Amino acid sequence: MAAAAGSCARVAAWGGKLRRGLAVSRQAVRSPGPLAAAVAGAALAGAGAAWHHSRVSVAARDGSFTVSAQKNVEHGIIYIGKPSLRKQRFMQFSSLEHEGEYYMTPRDFLFSVMFEQMERKTSVKKLTKKDIEDTLSGIQTAGCGSTFFRDLGDKGLISYTEYLFLLTILTKPHSGFHVAFKMLDTDGNEMIEKREFFKLQKIISKQDDLMTVKTNETGYQEAIVKEPEINTTLQMRFFGKRGQRKLHYKEFRRFMENLQTEIQEMEFLQFSKGLSFMRKEDFAEWLLFFTNTENKDIYWKNVREKLSAGESISLDEFKSFCHFTTHLEDFAIAMQMFSLAHRPVRLAEFKRAVKVATGQELSNNILDTVFKIFDLDGDECLSHEEFLGVLKNRMHRGLWVPQHQSIQEYWKCVKKESIKGVKEVWKQAGKGLF
């Protein structure tokens, strides 16, 4: 009860800021789009539209970014040819640069997760060493809860590798991170040092980035892993200013949970227009925001004809659904049983599959909404394959490229890279594996 009350209080507080900032944001930004106008002013604690001016010209959904196709080096990974979709998106939203490397602020990261594109943006700011120290000065005093990125605002640096790492936290279950964490924990105390964390970050980030690239588009080579020459937000958050602290898995798990909660609360506020509840139409808009399937018009027809006006979804229901979306691979395996048996997926079967995949249940309110939206034939059955595609696009913010890689193959790659990382750690420590 206390936790729920706290969440409601946070939503109410941010909702108040959002509503007070709407007038300011609408005056400052010319034609920002219905969702950008709703949040750009106050939901990000003073993210005024003066922050937006021209720099990058971006096509909305076709991926034609004006990022030059060239050789790119980012903390040890060399990209040859056209950058990946995630790299393009990172360049679109990043606002800081130091010695040829681009960085996001915490506010940039939140915008990149919430919005499809940045319509107007200031010029990239070139940082000196003194600027970097000033930018990172607020991290030590910032709270470590579910408002961490909002509280920091522009006071922080996020590298491309860290950007990929944070996105993976939003789209994958915690279990895989725990496995990779333990693989790099050579002492068995569930604590890792800074250099080991870099390897964990590289392992996860590399796999996620490769999954957003079509094999005939981009060539990748991996250079020797090297530590960044400057501190970043995550480094100082986990290891302190001098990098001498150790990171315990429990602390890292709390960070993952808080990050997921923060993004969920931000997106809830964005699509509920700052209210403490989300209309079912708003939920459908959130669900279909990054979708370009040929059946999108049918989905919206279902929303208009099948969802009753005045019905809403609570923040807790929304969070439960977001938790479910981090287990899509496991859920897809459960759905394959119905495909192989040529059986339609009805509400009871869907509810059971969710419980098996996540260990939790979705409310009947959410399930009823999902079924009404994705019932293409009017037979009260779910078109689950396209439903999964819509959800994957939603969670990957429109950058998902369909793969033939299963979750087992994904974590097999992670395990392989983890073993390589372990060998390097032991080699540096002057120890043998056995």
Swiss-Prot record:
A GO term, aspect molecular function: calcium channel regulator activity
Compartments where located: Mitochondrion intermembrane space; Mitochondrion inner membrane
Range annotated as the organelle transit peptide: 1-22
Annotated effect of mutating residue 107 to E: Does not affect its ability to regulate the activity of MCU
SUPFAM superfamilies: EF-hand
Swiss-Prot/TrEMBL GO biological process terms: calcium import into the mitochondrion; cellular response to calcium ion; mitochondrial calcium ion homeostasis; mitochondrial calcium ion transmembrane transport; negative regulation of mitochondrial calcium ion concentration; positive regulation of mitochondrial calcium ion concentration
Domain of life: Eukaryota
Residues at which Ca(2+) 2 binds: 375, 377, 379, 381, 386
Keywords, in A-Z order: Disulfide bond, Membrane, Mitochondrion, Mitochondrion inner membrane, Phosphoprotein, Repeat, Transit peptide
GO cellular component labels: calcium channel complex; mitochondrial inner membrane; mitochondrial intermembrane space; mitochondrion; uniplex complex
Residues reported in the UniProt entry to bind Ca(2+) 1: 185, 187, 189, 191, 193, 196
Outcome of swapping residue 329 to A: Does not affect interaction with MICU1
CDD domains: EFh_MICU2
Result, substituting residue 352 to A: Abolished interaction with MICU1
Domain (EF-hand): residue spans on this chain: 172-207, 227-262, 293-328, 362-397
Gene3D superfamilies: EF-hand
Phosphoserine: modified positions: 205
Subunit structure: Heterodimer; disulfide-linked; heterodimerizes with MICU1. Component of the uniplex complex, composed of MCU, EMRE/SMDT1, MICU1 and MICU2 in a 4:4:1:1 stoichiometry.
Main function: Calcium sensor of the mitochondrial calcium uniporter (MCU) channel, which senses calcium level via its EF-hand domains. MICU1 and MICU2 form a disulfide-linked heterodimer that stimulates and inhibits MCU activity, depending on the concentration of calcium. At low calcium levels, MICU1 occludes the pore of the MCU channel, preventing mitochondrial calcium uptake.
Domain-related comment: EF-hand domains 1 and 4 have high affinity for calcium and act as sensors of mitochondrial matrix calcium levels. EF-hand domains 2 and 3 are degenerate.
The family this protein is said to belong to: Belongs to the MICU1 family. MICU2 subfamily.
Protein name in the entry: Calcium uptake protein 2, mitochondrial
